[in-house]
Amino acid sequence: MLLAGDIVSSIVMLLFLYTSISKFLDQQLFKNVLLASPLLRPVAGIIAKVLPLLEIAIAVLLFIPSSRVTGLYTSALLILSFTIYLGYMIIFIPALPCSCGGVIRYLTWQQHIVFNLCFILLSFVGIYLYKKSTWHFRTPP
């Protein structure tokens, strides 16, 4: 169970490393996309600086064995927040631009929501696996 939890943490960690690095590599594009969103325009500059750092922090939490459960909870919360934002944007501003890189850039917004929901589920599977492993070790024989 612990190995499976480590694999889940690694997959989620790689997602956060990938997204943070892509934002750092083209921060102006990321900021421009945020500025194109009426909902985020007032705080676009702050989000453009803070979000990649938050994603790196989550990746670090997922890397350190003693903080993986916290990292998984935090990742699920951040991805859920982004998914709610996407749902709002799909309904009210369907022409939202995307600064996603790699394979993710080819997803529609609806597919992106499904992708996010899969990673939220994966985070909770990881939490379950870690908690089950911890519980198992505490149970007397």
Language-model regions, residue ranges each:
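Membrane-interfacial helix-loop segments of redox and metal-homeostasis proteins
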Residues: 1-141
